[in-house]
Design a protein with these regions (language model features):
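Short alpha-helix C-terminal cap/hinge motif
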Residues: 43-59
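A ligand-binding cleft/hinge motif common to bilobed small-molecule-binding domains
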Residues: 90-94, 205, 209-230, 279
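Extracellular/periplasmic bilobal clamshell ligand-binding domains
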Residues: 292-327
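A bilobed periplasmic-binding-protein/Venus flytrap-type ligand-binding module shared by bacterial periplasmic
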Residues: 130-137, 172, 243-256, 274-277
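Gram-negative bacterial Sec-dependent N-terminal signal peptides
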Residues: 1-21
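Mature extracytoplasmic/periplasmic domains
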Residues: 250-304
Length: 327
């Protein structure tokens, strides 16, 4: 009998422990790989949010930003994500059409170069696309000058990468109906096309290309983290394309309250102060930028297609790009 009582007590302890674990709510956030990396914003944001939510915040990487949309379209209502973080305005119209997202209910004074009134997609950072190169590389200030040069570049695939898709929108915004010819002329300059930003940037750092498609903020990483001021970005005369990255709440999440809390957290200093020195982008709300950001290239002009226009032209631009580079 004594042995049986001990056994029951042990089982009771295990059940209590299991119940305690089960009561810890979990919020799943689907995002891009670099956000979850040890050098990305994910770890610091996870620590900060868990300290105030008594929850488990789980980030899941799904490739680069554009791959998020493909995964959502595949999973539909079966997704276990409560938050999707890492789409941009070139994808939000298509994402909205999935019917997966609910209004975020967050109000904030955003520091974006464009007006923002979207009640579903909440901006968490932004930046200008640009080609990043060594300072001693002769700069170019237009796509035409780049195509006419001997410079070698690395870009990202627009089907899986938001910077890659942004480049297509940028070329389209500048060259319109002549964009397909521009891609044909650029083909000789392109060393390779990578699935995502990380692979492309690493090839540039390895000396495989003269320049890489990235952001005007990318040199800040080298300056601040490595004390290296040898990198720069190029402002184009016609303007540089703007990227605004967003988060959204999944409508059918079983952690509605926690998801709402995290969406509000995104627009707080605890989240936003992490962005400049981990995601190396501009924060979406007023905050103090680190020393070194004041040295960055600031384009004289920014350009951004509306989310609906981007959705309308996306497939055609991707097909024209694919055709030009396969010739």
């Amino acid at each position: 009998m004594k042995i049986e009582l001990l056994g029951l007590a042990s089982v009771g302890a295990i059940l209590c422990a299991s119940t305690g674990l089960a009561q810890t709510p979990t919020l799943n956030v689907l995002t891009y790989d670099s956000f979850t990396s040890e050098w990305g914003p994910g770890p610091a944001i996870e620590t900060a949010f868990e300290a105030e939510c008594a929850c488990d915040l789980v980030f899941t990487g799904a490739g680069d930003g554009a791959a998020l949309l493909a995964r959502l379209q595949l999973e539909g209502m079966r997704t276990d994500a409560g938050i999707v973080l890492g789409l941009d305005t070139n994808l939000t119209a298509a994402a909205r059409d999935t019917g997966l997202f609910a209004p975020h209910g967050v109000t904030s004074d955003f520091t974006l170069p464009v007006a923002w009134d979207d009640d579903t997609f909440l901006p968490f950072d932004w930046g200008y696309l640009a080609f990043v190169a060594q300072k001693d590389t002769p700069p170019v200030t237009s796509f035409r000058a780049l195509a006419d040069s001997d410079l070698k570049i690395v870009i990202q695939d627009p089907r899986s990468s938001t910077p890659g898709l942004g480049l297509l929108m940028w070329v389209h915004a500048v060259h319109g109906d002549e964009a397909a010819q521009l891609w044909t002329d650029l083909a000789d300059n392109i060393v390779t096309v990578t699935p995502g930003w990380t692979e492309a940037y690493n090839l540039f750092l390895a000396g495989e290309a003269d320049a890489v498609l990235s952001y005007t903020t990318s040199p800040a990483y080298h300056l601040i983290a490595e004390d290296d001021d040898t990198k720069t970005s190029w402002a184009f005369d016609a303007g540089n394309y703007l990227q605004v990255e967003v988060a959204a709440k999944v409508a059918n999440t079983d952690q509605t309250g926690l998801a709402d809390r995290f969406m509000a957290f995104i627009a707080s200093p605890a989240f936003q102060d992490v962005i400049p020195e981990t995601n190396w982008m501009y924060p979406a709300i007023p905050t103090t930028l680190p020393a070194g950001f004041d040295t960055l290239t600031v384009p004289a002009k920014g350009m951004l297609l509306s989310s609906q226009e981007a959705a309308d032209v996306r497939d055609g631009l991707v097909e024209a790009w694919r055709t030009a580079l396969s010739q």
